[in-house]
Every structure is written in structure tokens, then in C-alpha cells.
Amino acid sequence: WRILNESGTLYLHLDYRESHYAKVLLDALFGRDCFLNEIIWAYDYGAKSKSRWPSKHDTILVYVKNPDSYYFDSSAVDREPYMAPGLVTPEKAERGKLPTDVWWHTIVSTTGREKTGYPTQKPLGILRRIIQASSKEGDLVLDFFAGSGTTGAAAAELGRRFILIDQNPESIAVISGRLEKQGVAFELQRARPQNR
């Protein structure tokens, strides 16, 4: 919380097993008035269950540091098609609509070009949307659990600076390879344990 810019936004991605705990924690940390959205990232891929409703979504909790001065630019985000285009004018159907708090976006294909091989890789489209809406060109984006480096890849593509943090050596190798392949200049720093 202390390092978040006054106009900054926190996006926390979780699955159904943890989101309710995190919501209570973040309400206590930020204050309930700083809760902006609960985004549902829905996808149609993964496990099938006959004993319960199959889980086909993740949750992204969105908090702002200051509800009076946070940055949000919905016009920077790609529009999406109407689900029932016949119910709106042809002009509106062609223009599309702004995304709501339910994002239909496939997971990263196991055979697609975007795949890095990292097990919990997030799609570039999801991070692009988050970064476009909540930051300006030149802003700093921070990911404490960088995984496959999707946040850095999207930030670089959109002209944002970024800091990626992860302690997993596999993650660091994937991120380094991904950013090098993308032609992104970066500096790798290893944390040194500190005695307290």
C-alpha cells in the first residue's frame, strides 16, 4: 500500500478458493471505499466435473489507493462485440461496446504462439486491458508474482516501465527468455537476504 502511487490501482488475480479471503484482507488494508471492482475473467477451458458446477472463471479484485484521484481510462481499452448485435443500431454494433466487469477471454492455448511453457501463464490480452485502463504511457507497473512475465511483456508493448518480481528460478528463466525474444531491454537483479 505504501509504495502505490496516489492515483494507482491494485489488481489482484485469484481463483474461487481464495478471493473471498483476499477481499476481506484488502478491505481492511485499503478501506472498503477503495474497492473499485470485482472482475470475473470467464473462460471455457479446463476441468470438467460431474459432481459440481465446473469452475470456469477467475476473480480479479480491483482497489485504488485514493477513490478521489485514481486513473482510469476506459477509452484506451479495445471495445468488444455486442452479444446480441441485432438489438442495437448497426452503427453501435460496428463500434462495439466497452467491456463490463465480466471478461470473456480464453486461457493461453497449449499450442499457441503466446505459450511460454510456464504453468500459470496469463493471456496477454488480459494484462493489456488492465494496463491500458489504469496507467499512462511512461507509468511504472509492478508485478510481485511475475510468473511468465506477461505483465512486463504487455507493459513494454504499451510504453510503460515495469518491475517484475519472482523468486522461482524457472519463472526468472522464462521471463528473461520472453523479454529477450521480444527485444525488450531489462536488467536482472538478484535480491540479497538482509538480516533484521
Label each residue range with its predicted role.
Residues 170-196:
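PRPP-dependent phosphoribosyltransferase catalytic core
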